[in-house]
UniProtKB/Swiss-Prot annotation:
Organism: Thermofilum pendens (strain DSM 2475 / Hrk 5)
Protein name per the record: Prefoldin subunit alpha
Gene name per UniProt: pfdA
Gene Ontology biological-process annotations: protein folding
Pfam family, one: Prefoldin
UniProt main location, coarse: cytoplasm
Subunit structure: Heterohexamer of two alpha and four beta subunits.
Cellular location(s): Cytoplasm
Taxonomic lineage: Archaea, Thermoproteota, Thermoprotei, Thermofilales, Thermofilaceae
Alphabetized SUPFAM superfamilies for the sequence: Prefoldin
């Protein structure tokens, strides 16, 4: 009986860590989804600006640089490994929407995993009491 309780306590501890990691992954993916939405909106807004229009571009940590719009019909899109590809507005938005869908599916899978882990944690809690 004592070994069984020890085993359950160990399993509980491992599952609690797994649940925390799943929650972090879900939160990160949701943050990335919000960034993708923001990028899509920015692309659409920029594409409607006239050539030469001055804008502020964020550099980092609340620092901005003034820039002028040139050739807003093409955008450089990061596709991974520091590789940029020139895409039209429609292509860029399509790429970002695909990325958003992949992230949404990841969130769904991780939520399912988290629900299973939480269910097992509850089983352990009820069996220990």
């Amino acid at each position: 009986m004592a070994q069984s309780r020890e085993r359950l306590a160990e399993e509980y501890s491992v599952l609690a860590q797994v649940a925390e990691e799943l929650q972090r992954e879900i939160q990160l993916a949701q943050t990335l989804i919000a960034e993708v939405d923001s990028a899509i909106l920015a692309l659409k807004n920029i594409s409607s600006l006239e050539d030469g229009k001055e804008i502020l571009v964020p550099v980092s940590a609340g620092v901005y640089v003034r820039a002028s719009i040139k050739r807003q019909e093409k955008f450089l899109v990061a596709i991974g490994s520091n590789i940029l590809v020139e895409k039209s507005l429609d292509e860029a938005v399509e790429f970002l929407n695909k990325r958003k869908e992949e992230l949404s599916q990841l969130v769904e899978r991780r939520m399912n995993d988290l629900n299973k882990v939480v269910a097992r944690i509850r089983e352990i809690e009820s069996s220990i009491r």
